[in-house]
UniProtKB/Swiss-Prot annotation:
Function, as annotated: Transfers the gamma-phosphate of ATP to the 4'-position of a tetraacyldisaccharide 1-phosphate intermediate (termed DS-1-P) to form tetraacyldisaccharide 1,4'-bis-phosphate (lipid IVA).
Gene that encodes the chain: lpxK
Organism classification: Bacteria, Pseudomonadati, Pseudomonadota, Betaproteobacteria, Burkholderiales
Species this protein is from: Paraburkholderia xenovorans (strain LB400)
UniProt-recorded name of the protein: Tetraacyldisaccharide 4'-kinase
Stored NCBIfam families: lpxK (TIGR00682)
Record's keyword terms, sorted: ATP-binding, Kinase, Lipid A biosynthesis, Lipid biosynthesis, Lipid metabolism, Nucleotide-binding, Transferase
Amino acid sequence: MSEISNRLEARLAREWQQRGPLAWALTPFACVFGAIAAARRAAFSFGWLKSVRVGVPVVVVGNVTVGGTGKTPTVIALVEALRVAGFNPGVVSRGYGARVTTPTQITPASAASVGGDEPLLISRRTGAPVWVCPDRVAAAQALCAAHREVDVIVSDDGLQHYRLQRDVELVVFDHRLGGNGFLLPAGPLREPLSRRRDATLINDPYARTLPAWPNTFALQLAPGDAWHLDNPALRRPLAQFSGDRVLAAAGIGAPERFFATLRAAGLTPATRALPDHYAFERNPFTDVDADTILITEKDAVKLGSWHDARIWVVPVEAALDHRLIALVVEKVRGRSPA
């Protein structure tokens, strides 16, 4: 079933990169989607629907396209940058696939099934307070009440969650940018490319030039040394796997980006794309004839109680442009209480 789902997703992703017959056939539905989205934005803008400002500045890191673009590494890097600037950041998230319906704190010891894989990874990587809830306002209010030291909140995704007032909006794109430029379902866009934002980050290592949008910055993602799943203290540079029979597996929004990263490091892995947010309740690699299995950090936090000594985890670090950090810090300081 997952193989069929992967094929359908791949087909749709290809269609969204061009203005073919299927895309044009779906444009009436895209017009309806766009009208509903615009009406909702207007309702919040004019105060017909109430938005809520929490007691600290809010920075939203999101996207206007469907699929993974590199938001989670960006959130992790931004939390660290805000710390360096003297802030005490916290993080809120919806928690994709989470079981929780009320504000819940995610700690490094939490299960991915409780709050989702991305919040758990952020908690483990940053040590910052992380709260999840389908209602991001409730999550932010609970975070502020429980952690009085927090003086800025980073929202992992939630660009379209207008009920939570925000002070900075960062939009992340990968190499696909806006695809064919059509709204869902004719294209990959949740909102028009012209949507207002404070800055744009482009996650494309092969881009020679950036779009001529205001405050647009390159987002650099680089893999670190792999660590062994059973013994995280055991680390190896990716180049050391070049003589192994390697399988690269990823259950993320853009698995091909992970595979390309490994190829750029000199590896020639077999690949297996799993559905985004794949649960890993059982070992999906029992049929794999490989010396080494490389997975993402986001997938590693979801692995159950089963054991496979071949698995190594590849972390990814995001490098933020210093000008972007300065822009965010300036806006946050401008909103912070004196």
